[in-house]
């Protein structure tokens, strides 16, 4: 399964991340891309960013997010992703079924 992860710096964090934590986060995410655990990662100008993770469950995503070096410095929004072609086929099939019922 694929998950869109949007991360934003957590406002009011008591402890600020160090340069060492920033580098560890970078290396961890780039390594995840090389291993196929993530498809991509992009930063937002001004802080935060997005990535697309590959995982077998929501629990796996949660574990990976909060075990990352900056896991407690971000607020996360996680959205499961569907294959576009399959999604649109399902919508079209549902509409076709509804159209047949209304005839």
Where do the language-model regions lie?
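Conserved, structured core segments of small domains
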Residues: 1-103
């Amino acid at each position: 399964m694929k998950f869109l992860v949007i991360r934003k710096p957590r406002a009011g964090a008591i402890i600020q991340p160090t340069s060492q934590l920033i580098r560890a986060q970078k290396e961890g995410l780039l390594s995840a891309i090389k291993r196929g655990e993530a498809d991509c990662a992009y930063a937002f100008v001004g802080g935060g960013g997005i990535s697309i993770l590959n995982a077998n469950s929501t629990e796996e995503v949660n574990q990976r997010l909060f075990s990352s070096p900056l896991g407690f410095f971000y607020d996360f929004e996680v959205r499961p992703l569907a294959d576009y072609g399959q999604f649109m086929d399902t919508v079209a099939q549902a509409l076709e079924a509804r159209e047949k019922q209304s005839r």
